[in-house]
Amino acid sequence: MTNIRIGQGYDVHQLTEGRKLILGGVEIPFEKGLLGHSDADALLHAVTDALLGAAGLGDIGSHFPDTAAEFKDADSRVLLRAAYQSVQAQGWQAVNVDTTVIAQKPKLAPHIPQMRANIAADLGIDISCVNIKGKTNEKLGYLGRMEGIESQAAVLLVRI
C-alpha cells in the first residue's frame, strides 16, 4: 500500500435562470445559477469527487445520491466536509488541492480568494495549499455559449 495518492474530480452543471450561482461555497452575483439537486456547486463537487477517488471511496453520487430527499438543496460545503471525514477515517489527509473552473461568464477572479479560504477551512489545510484557476472556453462549445460551468480538481492525499 502506498503512502500517497492522487485523486481527480470533474463536474459540470447547466446554467439556468431562477437559481443562485454558488462556486467554492461563494454566492456569485449573476443572472443565472447552476441547476442541480443540491446547491449545484460544481467546484466543490469536483473537489469532493477527487478526495473520494484518491481514497478509493467511490464518487459523490454514491455517497450523496441526487435521488435522496435529504440532499435536496444541500450545501456542498457540508457534503465536502462529510466526504473528507470518510477520507480521514480511512487514514488519509489532504496535502493540496488544484482546481480549474471553466466559465465564459461571470469573471471568477474577484471570488477566488474566498473560494480558496472556504476549501482550505473545510479540509483543515493552509490556504497556500489550495489553488483555483478560472478559465473561459474562448466562446467555444456549450461552455462558450454560457450553457454551463465545468470544474476539474486534483488532490494529493498522504497516509496519516
From Swiss-Prot:
Keywords in alphabetical order: Isoprene biosynthesis, Lyase, Metal-binding
Listed Pfam families: YgbB (PF02542)
UniProt-annotated binding residues for 4-CDP-2-C-methyl-D-erythritol 2-phosphate: D11, V12, H13, H37, S38, D59, I60, G61, R145
Disulphide bridges: none
Catalytic activity: 4-CDP-2-C-methyl-D-erythritol 2-phosphate = 2-C-methyl-D-erythritol 2,4-cyclic diphosphate + CMP
Any one GO biological process: isopentenyl diphosphate biosynthetic process, methylerythritol 4-phosphate pathway
Known cofactor(s): a divalent metal cation
A GO MF label: 2-C-methyl-D-erythritol 2,4-cyclodiphosphate synthase activity
SUPFAM superfamilies xref list: IpsF-like (SSF69765)
Record-marked site positions (Transition state stabilizer): H37, T136
Cofactor: record remark: Binds 1 divalent metal cation per subunit.
Chain sites annotated for binding a divalent metal cation: D11, H13, H45
Pathway participation: Isoprenoid biosynthesis; isopentenyl diphosphate biosynthesis via DXP pathway; isopentenyl diphosphate from 1-deoxy-D-xylulose 5-phosphate: step 4/6
EC number: 4.6.1.12
Assigned protein family: Belongs to the IspF family.
Function: Involved in the biosynthesis of isopentenyl diphosphate (IPP) and dimethylallyl diphosphate (DMAPP), two major building blocks of isoprenoid compounds. Catalyzes the conversion of 4-diphosphocytidyl-2-C-methyl-D-erythritol 2-phosphate (CDP-ME2P) to 2-C-methyl-D-erythritol 2,4-cyclodiphosphate (ME-CPP) with a corresponding release of cytidine 5-monophosphate (CMP).
HAMAP family in the record: IspF (MF_00107)
Subunit field text: Homotrimer.
Protein name from the UniProt record: 2-C-methyl-D-erythritol 2,4-cyclodiphosphate synthase
Organism in which the protein naturally occurs: Neisseria meningitidis serogroup A / serotype 4A (strain DSM 15465 / Z2491)
Name of the gene: ispF
